[in-house]
Each structure stands twice: as structure tokens, then as C-alpha cells.
């Protein structure tokens, strides 16, 4: 079979969007879901899908993408080991260290390169998916030592063809970063929604843009939010401690002086810096040969400083560097 064959295990929001986007980019795709109703919906939309993981993994040369919630990874991997032990394997799970450890333990012969598209909505399920979900998004591609350069290039190429740009990162650095910018926001949104509701009917009647924006992700499926937050416990605890320290300082200042200048100004400057970095043109570039001995280390270094991969040709990648 062609190397541009993709098998997606799990057809919810992210897996379903991946199936759609990859098919639109010219990949031959097949999806697998446990639910017969989901498979019927996928087939009705014109895609190849099955409830049988053995059937889904029948193409020996397919790139296999795990798109299941973190707790289900350890249930799926033994079946991958049984039917496709030497496969090219990636995933779209939002926590990377537990997945990498599970792959090493349960499918040690797989050629694994992890992934995480930083995209989503508060909705879930196949019907919520979209072929354009990843357009303009960051897509982490795991760049730990030992990653197969051919598989790395294929996973990065898939992300690029789905409309994303690639951020090369090590698993530990990824988990620490997303604890702050993804998992903590989900937790804070849950707290904010509860605090607002605690104000009763009047508070809810007056709630407007700031409350709606701040609590959007609190509408996500609770089981999925718990899975990613609890699965990144150590990194999230550090982020929570940082947030509590800042809230404590704000409370202390408000109680003692009535002022919140330091907290509000720090947040304002941080948001402006984020917007500026996102909008700044990237004029500096670098090319990396993925077969070079230090390629992965260099990719991690550049990724940690905001660089992104914008093209991959065979085993050479082209990066735009942060200004």
C-alpha cells in the first residue's frame, strides 16, 4: 500500500476531523470506532470505517493515528501490538508522556512519533468534526531522541497537509507547556462557571461576554477534560500553584490597599506580548536534515524558542524562526 495511507483509531471531534482533513489532502483513509452508530454515520459521509480494529489495521504500511481519550490508550495499544506490532504510529492525545510510556511498554516495536494538534471546540463527537479544524493551528510533533526520522517526517507532513504548522517539542516540555495554556484554562473555566452560578439568577441574567468567553471550555465533555487534566497531574499542579500564588497576591493587595494594578498590568502585558508574537512576521529560517545526529536536539531547541516547521521534503524540514 502507499505510504500515504492513514488509519485513524477513534472518530470523535479530533479523530473525525483528522480523517476528513487527511482525505481532503489526498491520503487514503480508514477510520475505526467501537460504536456501530458512529461507524454508520462515518460511512454515510462517504468514508471507509469499521468497528473492527483488526480490519482497520489490515494495511501494513499505513500510518496509524490514535485518537482516543487518554484512559483508553492502554486498552487500544495491546490490540495494535497484536495486529500491527511494527506499524508507524502517532497519536493526537493532549498529554504526551503517559502515551509515550505506554507505547514503549505495550508496543515496543512500533515506530512511534507522538503528536498533539492544538485545536478543538467545546463540542465533541464525529458530528462536531471539520476538515478545517486544524487550519492555522499549532501541531506538536514529538521530537525526543530515538524518533525515526522517516516517521517524524511523515507525521509532520500529515500535520502540514491538514493545514497546521508543526512545533517540534520533547514530551516533558510539551506537558509542562500545555498544563499552563490548555489544562489550567479548563480548570479555571470550571471554577469560574461555578463561582458565577453561585451568584444565583441575577448573576446569570447579567452574565455577558467576559463570563461567556472565560467559561467556554467549561462546556466541554467532563470526562475528556478530566482525562487530560488528571493525566497531566504533576505539570498541572505546578501551574495551579503558580495561579494560586498570583491570585493570593492579588487578594492580598486588594485587601490591604484596594489596588490590583500589579496583577492587571502583568496580565495585560502578557496578553499583548502573545498577540504581538502571533502577528509578527517570521523572516528568519533554518533547514534541518532529519538524518543528522543532532537533528532532534536542534528541533527541540528551536521549538522551545517558538520556531515552527512549515515544510517537509523527504527527511529535510524547513523552519520559520521566532523573531
Label each region the model flagged.
Residues 133-219:
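Internal alpha-helical scaffold of NAD(P)-dependent oxidoreductase catalytic cores
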